[in-house]
Amino acid sequence: MDAVLLEHFPGALDTFPSSYFDEEDFFTDQSSRDPLEDGDELLGDEQAEVEFLSHQLHEYCYRDGACLLLQPAPSAAPHALAPPPLGDPGEPEDSGSYCCDAGAPLGAFPYSPGSPPSCLAYPCTAVLSPGTRLRGLNGAAAAAAAAARRRRRVRSEAELQQLRQAANVRERRRMQSINDAFEGLRSHIPTLPYEKRLSKVDTLRLAIGYINFLSELVQADLPLRGSGTGGCGGPGGSRHLGGDSPGNQAQKVIICHRGTRSPSPSDPDYGLPPLAGHSLSWADEKQLKEQNIIRTAKVWTPEDPRKLNSKSFDNIENEPPFEFVS
């Protein structure tokens, strides 16, 4: 038993004080003595040896607060002494360096012949490479930060109520801005006097059809004989598009009706309800002198999109142009 324990100490017998070896029965065979005669004495001697060796082993592992490296016994089991793999494969591992736990009490190291103390079955922190220790610290810090993020501060009932009220205010403001935008869009689309206000979907459909209609009017080239000059205004004023164009294209004018009507009975629109919207018109003074000239114009006819039997906007745009003979 004593020979196996001394294999763990590089200094061998020099490590122990000389007073320990002065006892007569240190190297004697204890099995030759009769345990019935001196059983109490044998038990006391064995306990004293275990305590002394545990104290010496602990002092050797942590001398002056520094962890000293111990080489494992050759007869130790590989699975008991194999340290867990730490660090990258390219870094050297000190697989044979072990030390005792600093917090282990004296005499707390169980021992059996043929196996090292249990404190030697764990690798010492001092033998790890600097890169491995740094990665371990970084991993611990990252785990602590993640745990702190997962822990959410418990809000009080007053704070929750305040957050709900702020969210409701933001939602009301958002809906109010959307409603204001649709009201502005409805004011620019020529519509019939509906009994109820158009929904958002119907307003968007009318706006799409009306925008396509105006785009076709602006981009269409209607050849007219001669260079026309133009323009007739309306009650609400007019806006010119493109100015005088070369060739036979006449000047196009978009008239913005603001719903004002002349009170004069001679007005052809006298008595009709005001219709806000736009119209496109042009005039050619040279063609006014000629007879039997057919002039065409595409007319925008707003319809109620809520009617099931109403025409689609594609059909409205594809209607044949309005014709009249001057």
Swiss-Prot record:
BP GO annotations: amacrine cell differentiation; cell fate commitment; cerebellum development; developmental process; exocrine pancreas development; generation of neurons; hindbrain development; neuron differentiation
Chief localization: nucleus
Subcellular locations according to the entry: Nucleus; Cytoplasm
Domain of life per record: Eukaryota
Residue stretches in coiled coil: none
Tissue: Exocrine pancreas-specific. Expressed in azaserine-induced pancreatic tumors (at protein level). Expressed in AR42J cells but not in ARIP, DSL6A, or DSL6B cells. Down-regulation is associated with the change of an azaserine-induced acinar cell carcinoma to a ductal phenotype.
Gene Ontology CC annotation, any one: transcription regulator complex
Record keywords: Cytoplasm, Developmental protein, Differentiation, DNA-binding, Neurogenesis, Nucleus, Transcription, Transcription regulation
Pfam families: HLH
Protein task: Transcription factor implicated in the cell fate determination in various organs. Binds to the E-box consensus sequence 5'-CANNTG-3'. Plays a role in early and late pancreas development and differentiation. Important for determining whether cells allocated to the pancreatic buds continue towards pancreatic organogenesis or revert back to duodenal fates. May be involved in the maintenance of exocrine pancreas-specific gene expression including ELA1 and amylase. Required for the formation of pancreatic acinar and ductal cells. Plays an important role in cerebellar development.
Protein name stated in the entry: Pancreas transcription factor 1 subunit alpha
Originating organism: Rattus norvegicus (Rat)
Gene: Ptf1a
